[in-house]
């Protein structure tokens, strides 16, 4: 389960930003993860709750948006979006794709008080 490691890394960023802004509490966190990141959303939510225990982020709301990955189609020369590893190019049907951001995960926004 690599979700715990991802949550620990995300919490370090969240905690650092909260401290930089003299926050007393982290209320909400918005994250984006790639559809091809192999991250299980329910496991990420569970691990995030564990990592945030007894911290200024305890009890904060986690909002996760799963975003399609971007890929370059070598046959029709377009940037396309894909949501599964075996998806062909939605424009031409080719399997000749180079996925650009298959493992992306980012913190989009943090709400503090």
Curated annotation (Swiss-Prot):
Record: residues binding Ni(2+): 2-3
This protein's UniProt keywords: Metal-binding, Nickel, Zinc
Domain of life from the UniProt record: Bacteria
Keyword Zinc included in the entry's annotation: yes
Binding positions for Zn(2+) per the UniProt entry: 73, 76, 89, 92
One GO BP annotation of this record: protein maturation
PROSITE patterns in the cross-refs: HYPA (PS01249)
Keyword Metal-binding belongs to the record: yes
InterPro entries, per database record: HybF, Hydgase_Ni_incorp_HypA/HybF_CS, HypA/HybF
Function comment: Involved in the maturation of [NiFe] hydrogenases. Required for nickel insertion into the metal center of the hydrogenase.
Record-given protein name: Hydrogenase maturation factor HybF
High-level lineage: Bacteria, Pseudomonadati, Pseudomonadota, Gammaproteobacteria, Enterobacterales
């Amino acid at each position: 389960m690599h979700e715990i490691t991802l949550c620990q890394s995300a919490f370090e960023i969240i905690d650092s930003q909260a401290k930089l802004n003299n926050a007393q509490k982290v209320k909400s966190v918005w994250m984006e993860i790639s559809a091809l990141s192999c991250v299980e959303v329910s496991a990420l939510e569970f691990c995030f709750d564990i990592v945030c225990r007894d911290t200024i982020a305890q009890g904060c709301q986690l909002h996760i948006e799963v975003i399609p990955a971007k890929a370059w189609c070598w046959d029709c020369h377009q940037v396309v979006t894909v949501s599964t590893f075996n998806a062909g190019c939605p424009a031409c049907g080719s399997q000749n794709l180079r996925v650009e951001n298959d493992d992306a995960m980012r913190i989009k926004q943090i709400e503090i008080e």
